[in-house]
Amino acid sequence: MRAVMALSGGMDSTALLMRLLAEGYQVSCLSYNYGQKHSIELERASANLSYLSKNEYIIDHRIADLSSAMGIFHSALTTDGFDVPEGHYEQEQMKQTVVPNRNAIFASILYGYALSVAIREETEVVIALGVHSGDHAIYPDCRPEFYKAIEHAFNIGNWDSNMVSFHLPYIAGDKESILRDAIISCERLNLDFDTVFRNTNTSYSPDSMGRSSGRTGADVERILAFHAIGRKDPIEYVDDWDIVLERALTIEKEH
């Protein structure tokens, strides 16, 4: 079985990679430098791929540099002087973290890559993405209807499109269910869950040492997910775990 996926270095795509490997897929990963303000996610992705390699899971990984084009897009994630908002991940101000048309661009490149692999290797290929229900409120390009429409358009616009299809296993789930799935995958692969997720970044505003602030919407969602499964997040935060957890729980209660 063959898969092509987007690996951001975040929690969701990392869990997806574990799932695909546990299911027996041969996986090729694309990461994107889209002009984001920090490269911590890409560094963490590389660290995880090195860990996988040491455990004899070899992943074909490429980084697509889109920074010259997407770096001029207006978003709190790409625009200097535009601060990343803090608070609950479904609050209105979190729309400031939307990068215009980002997932359409990413999906288009992935589709072309997957179709090329399918033709070259004469096999069917799935395009795997870690989008989930927690993103639906703020990010319209993470919703099921978006991927249904864009897959339809890509199918119309390409020969041999019957050889590729989108695979969105988390589309109806949330970060808690993603972590629970990852626990199972890591056990099947004989990998250490904490090591895998220590090599991830979810924060939109990590400090210069790569530590997560614990204050952005993405941080809060991640912290609450780890709390829900009864585990301490293995990444390093600017504040102690008890402090960031208490803050996240307060934000959740107030929301």
Residue ranges and their predicted role:
Residues 130, 206, 222:
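Conserved residues at the C-terminal ends of beta-strands
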Residues 244, 248-255:
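Iron-sulfur (Fe-S) cluster-binding modules
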Residues 127, 199-204, 231-239:
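Charge-dense, low-complexity polyampholytic segments
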Residues 210-245:
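Iron-sulfur (Fe-S) cluster-binding segments and ferredoxin-like electron-carrier domains
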Residues 1-193, 219:
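ATP-dependent adenylation/nucleotidyltransferase module used to activate substrates
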Residues 191-214:
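Immediate flanking context of iron-sulfur cluster ligation sites
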